[in-house]
Amino acid sequence: MSWIERIKSNITPTRKASIPEGVWTKCDSCGQVLYRAELERNLEVCPKCDHHMRMTARNRLHSLLDEGSLVELGSELEPKDVLKFRDSKKYKDRLASAQKETDEKDALVVMKGTLYGMPVVAAAFEFAFMGGSMGSVVGARFVRAVEQALEDNCPLICFSASGGARMQEALMSLMQMAKTSAALAKMQERGLPYISVLTDPTMGGVSASFAMLGDLNIAEPKALIGFAGPRVIEQTVREKLPPGFQRSEFLIEKGAIDMIVRRPEMRLKLASILAKLMNLPAPNPEAPREGVVVPPVPDQEPEA
């Protein structure tokens, strides 16, 4: 037996450690490999480059409202294919696919609860549901949120993330722009605050209606906000747009929004603003609140 064969016979192959799928993810901006649970604890914000990734509607509302205070509103409302609409795919099939993918009935989730003990109603878009498009159920749930805020005499907060009106519902989708705007007029008459938080992206009919009607319009960093997208505008005007066009930093320079707030600071900032507007005591930033329990980071990172 040669010396090479003797060495080979003494080598015991090790089993390759298997890492469950979904434990690791990659930042869309800087490409950093991130531990999924740690990223969730950081509210989907990259710890390396501060890129704000998209967040599910439920995670956003659970990260905002006090634990144990959340009550969902309008969950019984479901979309219907009244027009029997079909493009490359039947609308009812698109709905079924989106509902299966997101485990949501439609693109807006509404909850009431407390924020540092203060009663509020909050709504958040689920962008993964058909691009967060606004149909009749989104409009109805938003109006339900307004009605609940009026009933409870409390503020309303809405986190927008939408591509605009849902084309599969045609005019019924477009009329939600007027319906939601009219509902907000009642908030104004009552003197109750409505804060609109613009996240990436907020476009089309949503940006042209309730998303820009806040008493205070707050944006997350680098959020794309506008009506038509930059590519469409460039093709229409046949000119190159300036860097950062339609991003929140560009809009605040032009006075289109009121402030930019990082996601980890959003909860306390909203509570502080609303406490002042409602003439209530300032929130205590040291108030205890159970966070997400994060399991230990695995020893091995995924192979590149």
Swiss-Prot record:
Regions of compositional bias (Pro residues) in chain numbering: 295-304
Catalytic activity: N(6)-carboxybiotinyl-L-lysyl-[protein] + acetyl-CoA = N(6)-biotinyl-L-lysyl-[protein] + malonyl-CoA
EC number, UniProt record: 2.1.3.15
Pathway where this protein functions: Lipid metabolism; malonyl-CoA biosynthesis; malonyl-CoA from acetyl-CoA: step 1/1
One Pfam family hit: Carboxyl_trans
Zinc finger (C4-type) boundaries: 27-49
Gene Ontology annotations for the cellular component aspect, listed alphabetically: acetate CoA-transferase complex
Main subcellular localisation: cytoplasm
Subcellular location: Cytoplasm
Full protein name: Acetyl-coenzyme A carboxylase carboxyl transferase subunit beta
Gene name for this UniProt entry: accD
Stored Gene3D superfamilies: 2-enoyl-CoA Hydratase, Chain A, domain 1
PANTHER family: ACETYL-COENZYME A CARBOXYLASE CARBOXYL TRANSFERASE SUBUNIT BETA, CHLOROPLASTIC
GO BP terms: fatty acid biosynthetic process; malonyl-CoA biosynthetic process
GO MF term list: acetyl-CoA carboxylase activity; ATP binding; carboxyl- or carbamoyltransferase activity; zinc ion binding
The CoA carboxyltransferase N-terminal domain, residue ranges: 23-292
